[in-house]
Amino acid sequence: MNLILAILLMVVCLLAGFFLGTWFSQRQTKKLLMDNPPLNEDAVRLMMGSMGRKPSEVQVQQVLRQIRAAAKQSDTNKK
């Protein structure tokens, strides 16, 4: 009986550790992407330049704020 209980306890602890580790790493990844979005100022300038526009610094910052706001809003909508 003790052997079955020990094995069951190990399996439960392994599953709990797996799910907690997955949850924690997902949370850290979301936080990292919110703090450092993959689209930076140079990428926005390049994208606007490829569309034939010469963006000012104000326009670049406005686009970045819109991207961050949209990401934050989609994150809060999922909760």
UniProtKB/Swiss-Prot annotation:
Gene Ontology annotations for the cellular component aspect, listed alphabetically: plasma membrane
Keywords: Cell membrane, Membrane, Transmembrane, Transmembrane helix
Coiled coil: none
Chain segments annotated as transmembrane: 4-24
Membrane topology per record: Single-pass membrane protein
Domain of life: Bacteria
InterPro entries per UniProt: UPF0154 (IPR005359)
Protein location: Cell membrane
Keyword Cell membrane appears in the UniProt entry: yes
Pfam families from the UniProt entry: UPF0154 (PF03672)
Sequence similarity: Belongs to the UPF0154 family.
Record protein name field: UPF0154 protein llmg_1186
Species the sequence originates in: Lactococcus lactis subsp. cremoris (strain MG1363)
